[in-house]
């Protein structure tokens, strides 16, 4: 016996007649946003010399040691997780009263690292403790244990060094930490002239590339009048979109094909590495494997930003439900899991959220329960849907599964109180 979905209501029955199935010049959303300044990070690729790379590695070791010393002091309860207290204990050689800090008695090598880098590492430890205690107070976690940073993890995953505002860019010349690094070569353009507006960082990624992270202030737009769009995240179809004007499309299928090809090549290299006996050849193949992973990440990022640009330019609001990757991965096969994890739905969602905030667009994360199985015409649940690509209902509704789910996400959100103002706008646009 057929059954109505839990969120289907009388309002849903009215809205499903209002929301068109085909593209129409109606149902736009007036998005009034107060203009404000938001902080966004821009990446500039650096090309340091061999000597500068070695200096950065030494600075990273000193920053890691300072971080671990601060964590150890708080864990042993010899110091409180306070920035000023930890800074006085582990940063300066000479105190204000003229005495020398005993911490540096056998650790003079730390003084070779610039003070801003060690200071940011100590502040990072204090901020981590503050976040952990806040989560504990809000009962988000039951307990926590602050662990140390390891050299192995740093060599494998890279590092990030805070350099504050100790850099300048004039006439195409970038100087970072003048007393240590000096002039550093870079690719592209630097988003500031003179001194930066906020504290910057130097990052080394897992693939050995160095980046300068520059925070930049941007002003949001004040008003947009365009349709809103609901996005259904998935694996076979990464992003299915349905707009309030009836327009629909699927995005990310090309990305899936390219990422699958790269993963296939990685698997082939892995098999060759497992059978190889020559040490030098095995090292070369591991380097080749690392380059493939870097290509995988760059292809994914390029498609992410292309899709985000396409959506944010065409619509004034985005409805993007969270995709529970961890829960879904338990029910899928290994090959499908690799495809799902390669899409990086969480990273895409965070990027979309930041871009919507930057452009002053509506962004919300509604729930998506029963949106795939529910008929968008009669509200009945189709228990026989399974993994079918096409949705079919006894009422005669036949539609693409993912597009239909995206339409139901939009319909479900408009049926809630949060979408009440949007519904009024829709009705006004229909009557005018």
UniProtKB/Swiss-Prot annotation:
Induction entry: Expressed in the late phase of the viral replicative cycle.
Which protein, by its recorded name, is this? Putative transposase A625R
- Which positions bind Zn(2+)? 375, 378, 393, 395
Q: Name the family.
A: In the N-terminal section; belongs to the transposase 2 family.
Q: Which Pfam families match?
A: Cas12f1-like_TNB, HTH_OrfB_IS605
| Organism listed in the record | Paramecium bursaria Chlorella virus 1 (PBCV-1)
An example Gene Ontology molecular-function term: DNA binding
Q: Which residues form the signal peptide?
A: none
GO biological process terms held by the UniProt record: DNA recombination; transposition
The UniProt keywords, alphabetically, are:
DNA recombination, DNA-binding, Metal-binding, Transposition, Zinc
Question: Superkingdom of this entry's organism?
Answer: Viruses
UniProt keyword Metal-binding, yes or no: yes
